[in-house]
């Protein structure tokens, strides 16, 4: 990553790295680009709270950069009402809640590993290793479509993503978010019942 940023710096190219899902990674320190912002003023790392803190309507995010020139330009072009007071206050509270961060991270990491392991041993499905809060799964059983799996999940009051509209995927795929252990077990039961 640093080599790319360095080459972009030589060419006067500003780089933005989206780390919206970084909180879900096993070792944040190994993959974050934030330390590079101290060495390169052509870099900004952006993060949001909507994914990890389950607050999609909040629309709260932040960026880290050492570029005073970029910050000045950003402030000049920024919509004066880009963040309302409720969003600012809530975002501040969320980012200060160390217990939520620690507990949620532990739950996601353990449940993601457990779900991946269980699906890996379930004939008819091929899960793909993930660093996010969701797992992509290919359906291997002939005649079983992603829509069939979606419908079965909905009937059991579980929401998954039918990936048939993903142009880059050929074949039958579903994607699901990591949930609490009970709901994950319910999803495993639904998936197992279809093969």
Where are these regions (language model features)?
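Active-site pre-lysine segment of PLP-dependent enzymes
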Residues: 1-15, 19-53
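PLP-dependent aminotransferase class I/II
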Residues: 42-121, 125-128
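Short acidic/glycine-enriched loop/turn segments that link adjacent beta-strands
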Residues: 57, 131, 168-170
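Residue-level recognition of strand-loop junctions within catalytic nucleotide-signaling folds
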Residues: 66, 96, 140, 179-181
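Conserved PLP-binding catalytic core of the aspartate aminotransferase-like
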Residues: 108-109, 122-156
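PLP-dependent enzyme catalytic core of the Aspartate aminotransferase-like
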Residues: 155-156, 165-195
